[in-house]
Amino acid sequence: MAAQGFLLLASYLLVLLVLARPLGMCLARMVNDIPLPGLAGVERVLWRVAGIRAEEMGWLQYLLAILLFNALGGLALFALLMLQGVLPFNPQHLPGLSWDLALNTAISFISNTNWQAYAGESTMSYLSQMVGLTVQNFLSAATGIAVVFALTRAFARQKMSTLGNAWVDLTRITLWLLLPLSLLVALFFIQQGVPQNLQAYQPFITLEGVHQLLPMGPVASQEAIKLLGTNGGGFFNANSAHPFENPTALTNLVQMLAIFLIPTALCFAFGEVVSDRRQGRAILWAMTLIFILCVAVVMWAETRGNPHLLTLGADSSLNMEGKESRFGILASSLFAVITTAASCGAVNAMHDSFTALGGMVPMWLMQIGEVVFGGVGSGLYGMLLFVMLAVFIAGLMVGRTPEYLGKKIDVREMKMIALAILVTPTLVLLGTALAMMTDAGRAGMFNPGPHGFSEVLYAVTSAANNNGSAFAGLGAATPFWNLLLAFCMLVGRFAVIIPVMAIAGSLVAKKIQPASPGTLATHDALFIGLLIGTVLLVGALTFIPALALGPLAEHFSLL
């Protein structure tokens, strides 16, 4: 089993790197504002038709454009969900959503979280899925990538006040990156058996003679961007465990590759844009080493399973509960780590049924800020915050002014870094405490003891860090949970983007200092170790007391 797990992980990483590097070079052209071959004339026509003036923006103007863009998208999606009962493409005649569920869902999809307090096949019309949720999957992903484009330019430029044009970046990312990749992946899914139609649900009779409905819909098109954009929201309630979303072992592999493809490519693009490919590789190495460690722990925990099962007469202690037999333990464990490392939230197994340690690792990956590959864009700008923090700590230890890529890290940057890093832990801990202190919060708990607490902690962690996966034993479809998690998703997304853009605005105005003999090398093994240590110490220790009350207590209770 260990050899199989190693081969699965090694082959996955090999294919990922082969695919991501050339994509990273294309992304570097976008960051450098170089039109892709053959598209310059098309872009000029697009800018004229859309009324886009391609002048560059300062950080505040860029930020306001991003915030306005997402606010308008959220309002449009909220209205669509409320009115879906009277709109077309609704063959099942599904009613509009309640205001609190519509608000939760709208914020969920504009924040790239895709938390779902509903079952898609029994709640959403085809119009809501296509025009509402799928469109926001593209736009929320483009938002995250645009922000990291701006931050990357801040490191590459000097003595400037502009970071690019938000409307140009959003358009290019959507049309030339997300749309072509999604089309290719969707066509592959259709070939593998994923539905793509607008038919009404199909009645059929099971072998036992029971009459049921077979759900239909435009699944493949939403499935592709759900993964490539690290969105994660499933067309069906079972998400990628559903055979209509993820029918074969081959689609499962492609789904895992799609989740990490753009976050990995952005690391290569970063190194290319700052004219030092070693910097991008160093960040990628740090992410990969943490990822490998987490995969090993989850695979070990799930294959070890629960030893008490043997005393009850089970044939094996392997933890197959909540997993699809067509994927097995190893592929399910790998998928769980990928989807929580990348703030995707799609699942091909039920995380609530993992062992205590096997479920703790995905939760912990979210709690460290979704910086191990992370969401498209958000993962890299989150890790760059930790990079600058690590440089600052190293500077304090040796008594030198901290620098990264020739840019001095001053008091202003450190204040913004601290603010951005502290946003999500504050939301998670206060949100969990509020849920546990109130009757409305505890009413959603279906399980007592440490596991029930873990379900609450996981839900708030997932929302605040814009992941969207869940421990399913929590009744979150109530006004209390809809509003609490909506607040966490909204603040967890945009209260991080705001200081990141402020940092970019400060750095782009600074001069790039030439390296001196005393300059800290930020591309070697020593710095990679320092960066990993910073992520583990700052990002992880915050949650040790909470984890001790939940998954750790549950684990030791089984010994």
Swiss-Prot record:
Residues spanning the membrane: 5-25, 63-83, 131-151, 173-193, 254-274, 282-302, 327-347, 356-376, 379-399, 416-436, 483-503, 525-545
GO molecular function: P-type potassium transmembrane transporter activity; potassium ion binding
GO CC, any one term: plasma membrane
Keywords of this entry: Cell inner membrane, Cell membrane, Ion transport, Membrane, Potassium, Potassium transport, Transmembrane, Transmembrane helix, Transport
InterPro entries linked: KdpA
Principal location class: membrane
Membrane topology: Multi-pass membrane protein
Entry's localization field: Cell inner membrane
HAMAP family linked: KdpA
Role of this protein: Part of the high-affinity ATP-driven potassium transport (or Kdp) system, which catalyzes the hydrolysis of ATP coupled with the electrogenic transport of potassium into the cytoplasm. This subunit binds the periplasmic potassium ions and delivers the ions to the membrane domain of KdpB through an intramembrane tunnel.
Record text on subunit structure and interactions: The system is composed of three essential subunits: KdpA, KdpB and KdpC.
Family note: Belongs to the KdpA family.
Designated name of the protein: Potassium-transporting ATPase potassium-binding subunit
